[in-house]
Amino acid sequence: MNTRSFGNEMKRLGFDFYTGVPCSFLKNLINYAINECEYVGAANEGDAVAIASGAYLGGKKPVVLMQNSGLSNAVSPLVSLNYPFRIPVLGFVSWRGQPGYPDEPQHELMGQITTKILDSMQVKWMYLSTDMRTAKRQLLLAMRYIEKDNPFFFVVRKGTFEQEPLQKQLRPFNYPRISHASKAENEFPARQEALRIINGWKDGKTIQLATTGLTGRQLYEIEDASNNLYMVGSMGCVSSLGLGLALSKPDFDIVVIDGDGSLLMRMGNLATIGYYHPPNMIHILLDNNAHDSTGGQQTVSHNVSFVDMASACGYANSLYLRSLDDLDACLQKWKNKKGLTFAHLQISTRNEDPPRRPAVKPHEVKERLASFLNRGHLEAEGAES
């Protein structure tokens, strides 16, 4: 099938935001996406799904591309982010290890179970046809599922896409500012105190994304608002979600509130965020060296220099925060002068009271956030006119 013709049909239908991890079976479609659309190369397949989900919240129709060997990496966000929040994505997964066809031994088992994994996740799927007319009809069918807030995947056989040469890519290098070398004080603030400071800087152009566990629950108790999103499950994906949203909504301030256990799970996304460097995003790490919501088991965060890592990955500003006053000053500076920022605050494991879970359902959180973003977009258009 002619890759450019298929890609142009996708673009006509509104699919112009792509993210994923390469596969030789999909390389020509990936090349088209890089040449003609917005493409975000993800650190892993799960991050790609989360990035696409953030782009969807920002009004895009996202496409996720991956090899089937990485489909298992995408299971967590598909079942605990996209399913409960009812966030649709259009996926293309290659069929390496297709039974009856020669392939490398590492693809043998996944080739046998690829479609079974999709079935078990209740993801509708279809083998992508190599006939353009048929493929166009398949895209329209996929659209019907996506319009009902369901993900849809195409399983792609070898040789489906004809050659699409990759145009020369720019390789920007981001020069980060030197990290502040100050260390945290002995008396660490509580998470609730930090969240109150963060929430105090929220305005009508701010979106707050809180990682799974106690962070989201405590933010909910401080103030439940339509421009808050509380992650449930999909641990480690909050920064990926923030990247997708920041890239698709550059006129909004995206505040990502992460935890040490969460960030440790998907540290590769630091490099992806640093490369695409959305200036309207601040990534705040509240680090208590523990998995607090599961009993306080220790993480290895005390052995990791997150600030140096973020700086090395291309964050424009990376800094240690010594106190709540530092956090307040950091947010004020970022609000006044944007730039991709990573801020690390050591917090205690003490909690005032066990926080209750949000009463609002995840898909309701998504729907009201989408309405908030749409209102903000319309207000901006009205101001310009």
Tell what function each PLM region has.
Residues L140, S323-N336:
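A short, acidic, amphipathic alpha-helical segment used as a generic capping/interface helix at domain edges
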Residues Q208, I254-I257, I284:
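Residue-level marker for buried hydrophobic side chains located in beta-strands
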Residues M1-L243, L247-S248, F252, L321-L324, ...:
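Thiamine diphosphate
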Residues I282-G314, Y320:
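A contiguous pocket-lining binding segment that forms or flanks enzyme active sites
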